Amino acid sequence: MQITILGNSGPYPRAGGACSGYLLEDERFKILLDCGNGVLSRLLGKIKSLNDLDAIILSHLHFDHISDIMVMKYAIGINQEKGMTNKSIPLYAPNDPQDIYDMLQFKNAFKLNELNSKSILTFGDMKISFELMSHPITTYAVIVEKKGKKFVYTSDTKYCDVLIEMSKEAELLLCECNLLEKDKTEDAYHLSAREVGEVAALADVNKLLLTHIWPEYDLNEVLNEVKIMFSGDVEIATELETFEI
């Protein structure tokens, strides 16, 4: 398996960058995880056409994770009308808020499927499961397992015990890292860099990638704060870079 970082900022992109979006691939399947601002253009530079996508998974329905879906649906729906494709891409997402979920569809661009914490998806020998995170709207972490290896994408969340359990001995943990500890407040529904390091250390992950970083931060400062708690392999999830799992 491999994961390509299409965007790593939140809740808005750096100049020339993109918000959350990740292309998960193995020998047979291509699955898009989240589709925030700037992701569609990046995705089209990595695949031949949207027909190549086997599925899309939206971790939650905040716009920095879904805004380009609202454009992608036109690309697919209009191309269907023109006879350029007859494919409707399976799209999995929580239905909260319902009005945003209802906006995802355009014509027959997607086969919409509601996600919940008991959902299990299989693509060949890839098994994908979900854990409920702690965020203002329903948000799911994505856990991908294949041939004894585990990849975990946290999506957005504040610190919670399930983070450690679901990430135990992951080959790769792609973790949101939206705050520096000095900026953390009681009502923040995101992880500080220090907390990310603690999760990675307690879960004994093989490699840690930092994403969903506030675009005004100095990336070295973020990385150095993580390293206070985690002495393992850690780096920024650099946009357009591909990481093996």
Which residue ranges define each predicted feature?
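Short, surface-exposed connector motifs at secondary-structure boundaries
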Residues: 27, 81-82, 147-149, 202-209
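General small-molecule cofactor/ligand-binding pocket signal
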Residues: 4, 92, 111-116, 129-131, ...
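Active-site metal-binding motif and surrounding structural segment of the metallo-beta-lactamase
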Residues: 38-88
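Catalytic core of the metallo-beta-lactamase
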Residues: 113-169
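Metal-dependent catalytic neighborhoods of phosphoester/phosphodiester hydrolases
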Residues: 68-76, 100-103, 218-226
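Conserved beta-strand hairpin/beta-sheet module of binuclear metal-dependent hydrolase folds
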Residues: 1-46, 140-155, 172
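Active-site neighborhood of phospho(di)ester-bond hydrolases with catalytic His/Asp-centered motifs
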Residues: 32-36, 54-60, 64, 94, ...
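Cap/insert and terminal regions of metallo-dependent hydrolase folds
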Residues: 159-242
